[in-house]
Amino acid sequence: MGAESIHALRDVTIQIDKGEYVAIMGPSGSGKSTLMNLIGCLDTPTRGEYYLNGKLVSTMNDDELAYIRNKEIGFVFQTFNLLPRATALHNVELPLIYNGTAAAERIRRARTALEMVGLADRTNHKPNELSGGQKQKVAIARALANNPSLILADEPTGNLDSKSGADIMALLSELNRAGNTIIVVTHEREVAHCTNRIIYLRDGKIEREERPVGLKA
């Protein structure tokens, strides 16, 4: 007998418009990570189509995908992924360094991003001099540095205490009100209910969608 094919996602159809604030929620094995990788252009579907800003992702070459990941998508990870020996400012500069932004301009943009997340007084601090919540704010500032069309946050409060987690979700809500499109991947109901729309996955399929109580459809 041949190997059985395993489908991480099956018949998933989602449209997320500019300016939306969406949570993707589900238990372990539901397909959240796979969907996040597809949305973030870290993987491509074996079947079906994914359009980002009207562009069909599967037709892009490696250089085009790298450009999209750098310029169009701001990633926020559960584990922060900061360089331990670099200052907050330098960590935020990284995506700008990769795309060749001139030094003076990237420093200006990195400082502006840190100001946006309330860390103007922490620009020269290294990660070991910051709290967990401050580290995640640096990660969010890094995601904002290129002014991306989409912020993709994977379990952004997973390594934080409840107060720091609430602060991060309040910051993401503020960024959404300023016009940023944000997708949060989470298994925490409290986090999902900070968004405007929740997409529930189970066994690789969309189980249902809902809007948190008190929000207009």
Language-model features: where?
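ABC family nucleotide-binding domain
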Residues: M1-L201
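Conserved beta-strand-loop-alpha-helix hinge in the C-terminal portion
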Residues: K205-A217
